[in-house]
Amino acid sequence: MSIRTGLIGLGMMGRHHARVMRSIEGTELVAVADPFGDKHGAAAGLPLFQTVEELIAHGVDAVVCAVPTGLHEEVGLKLAAAGVHVMVEKPIAENVEAGQRLVDAFDSAGLVGAVGHIERFNPALQQMRKRIESGELGDIYQIATRRQGPFPARIADVGVVKDLGTHDIDLTAWIAQSPFAEVNAKTFTASERPHEDMIVATGRLASGVITNHIVNWLSPMKERLTIVTGERGAFVADTVTADLTFYENGSVPTEWDALSAFRGVSEGNVTRYAFAKAEPLKTEHEAFRDGILGNRNAYVSMREGLDTLRVAESMLESADSGSSVHL
């Protein structure tokens, strides 16, 4: 018997959810909802409702919540009370307090509560994590991320840290399999909005790994890089192209003095890996489905989403206070 799924929120991300949800084996997208209608044509003949109550009344087992961040708590709590499994877009909520209420509601109801931290499902990062787990990099020393691009007019209710930086917070802790212990950050605002447009942050994980993150939506150049440096070299994942490259530590002496000034005293092999590249959004939906069926727990839980939001708020606190924040 198929899982009856619904979608609330038909904006820029919601339309992509609608497309992918139609393709997930073992599920059936039965209805969608958005109080502002369906300007992207995502419903495509499905019942289109205005409220979450109407969506619940139609009969759904699971719902993807792609409404603005400020509405995550209200919509999520109504779905939890109705016994509906939910995957909410990231960040989990507008603030840690609201996120905690969502975690508590879904835990108490025994429901799957997931958060759409889609970067975990990027094939380049999944390959990287597998190779790190197998010991190919040895001990990890540092994780650095760069996430830059043009200003997205669609974002209005949160700043760049909660909208984009949460990607890097989540994937960093996930790759290292260690939570953040300390952060220090600086922010900059260029727009007339009340939120930050740029952040530069450093951190330390509980494992001792150091991190640094550059995130902004002020750059004309789109960049999505994760660099993990360890005792045997460095992995570089480009999540725009889903490419993974390994830079091996130098083993061959550089005899050309002028070249060694730029590249160092030795060189190692550089390998770009070939692997299957599934669409991250589809892989994310399959993980949500499998969690509902009890087959595996590869989805990002609301508790993990809450941890990520707590780190994001700690970065903002650090930027405001000018001091490091310990978690």
Language-model segments: what does each one mean?
Residues M1, A62-V64, A287-L327:
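C-terminal helix-rich "cap/oligomerization" subdomain common to oxidoreductases
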Residues M1-A44, T172:
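N-terminal Rossmann-like dinucleotide-binding module
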Residues H17, L46-A105:
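Beta-loop-alpha module in the N-terminal Rossmann-like domain of NAD(P)-dependent dehydrogenases
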Residues V88, G113-V115, A237:
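Hydrophobic residues in well-ordered beta-strands that form the structural core
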Residues A93-I155:
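A contiguous active-site-proximal alpha/beta segment in oxidoreductase catalytic domains
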Residues I118, R232-R303, V325-L327:
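C-terminal glycine/acidic-rich active-site capping loop/insertion
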Residues P152-M221, I227, R303:
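Rossmann-like dinucleotide-binding domain that binds NAD(P)(H)
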